[in-house]
Amino acid sequence: MDELIIAGKSFKSRLILGTSRYPNPQVMMEALEASGTEMVTVAIRRMDLKSDSAENIMKFLDDKKYFLLPNTAGCYTAKEAVLTAELAREALGTNWIKLEVLGDDETLFPDIPELLKAAETLLEKDFVVLPYTNDDPITCKKLSDMGCAAVMPLGAPIGSGMGIRNPYNLQIIREQIDIPLIVDAGVGTASDVAVAFELGVDGVLLNTAVAQAKHPVQMATAIKHAALAGRMAVNAGRIPKKLYATASSPTDDMIEIDG
């Protein structure tokens, strides 16, 4: 599979995995390995960076093997998100940030005015910003024009497992922006990953679909193959959809059969 390039950095895998809600750290590590991912996202506000306890997933993640992408999960204002990003940069030594600014704790949809405000501030502070946003082409174009390194529209609400609910918006976004387009949230199973790539997205970020699967490692393996299949399919070029049938066998020089 061709490489995913974000802000000049190359990744052989086009999958990004989250690190929360796994049964235990061992299952998490096995699932990450099975998925083939090279980038994992960690929620800065939900971990004790100074702790050496078993609950601190940072002690299990090899930063030489995985590119750590901190996120601002749990932030509801631009101010909270900016402060969290600065904490992540200080603690992890990275200026990359997956920017999340939520509107409420029920839908977990992004608060777009606060998101745009936070993105602008972080870009001024020399962060590499990857914003979680809704599947609105206008918002994604604004984020792209501001200088974000990628846009990450939701496929469906976070953790819903509903899959790609609005493929047409994703196609419009794909046509309107030149930076990487990464589906973030809503993926439920391997077929959702394949569909996303067939729509032309550059990457897929998922967490719950793997972490909460009955067999997380097996699901991680499935999404790895789904990503490969979806990306290969879109590069291969599918046939156009048509209302009427077209015979797959040629009709020229057919043997005449007397009735």
From Swiss-Prot:
Positions contributing to 1-deoxy-D-xylulose 5-phosphate binding: 159, 185-186, 207-208
Active site: 98 (schiff-base intermediate with dxp)
Disulfide bonds: none
Keywords for this protein: Cytoplasm, Schiff base, Thiamine biosynthesis, Transferase
Protein name from the UniProt record: Thiazole synthase
Function of the molecule: Catalyzes the rearrangement of 1-deoxy-D-xylulose 5-phosphate (DXP) to produce the thiazole phosphate moiety of thiamine. Sulfur is provided by the thiocarboxylate moiety of the carrier protein ThiS. In vitro, sulfur can be provided by H(2)S.
EC number, as in UniProt: 2.8.1.10
Pathway field: Cofactor biosynthesis; thiamine diphosphate biosynthesis
Major location category of this protein: cytoplasm
Pfam family, any one: ThiG
InterPro entries hit by this protein: Aldolase_TIM (IPR013785), Thiazole_synthase_ThiG (IPR033983), ThiG (IPR008867)
UniProt xrefs under HAMAP family: ThiG (MF_00443)
Coiled coil: none
Location within or outside the cell: Cytoplasm
Entry's family note: Belongs to the ThiG family.
GO biological process entries: thiamine diphosphate biosynthetic process
One GO CC annotation: cytoplasm
Transmembrane segments: none
GO molecular function: thiazole synthase activity
Species, as recorded: Chloroherpeton thalassium (strain ATCC 35110 / GB-78)
Keyword Transferase: yes
Catalysed conversion reaction: [ThiS sulfur-carrier protein]-C-terminal-Gly-aminoethanethioate + 2-iminoacetate + 1-deoxy-D-xylulose 5-phosphate = [ThiS sulfur-carrier protein]-C-terminal Gly-Gly + 2-[(2R,5Z)-2-carboxy-4-methylthiazol-5(2H)-ylidene]ethyl phosphate + 2 H2O + H(+)
Keyword GTP-binding: no
Complex formation: Homotetramer. Forms heterodimers with either ThiH or ThiS.
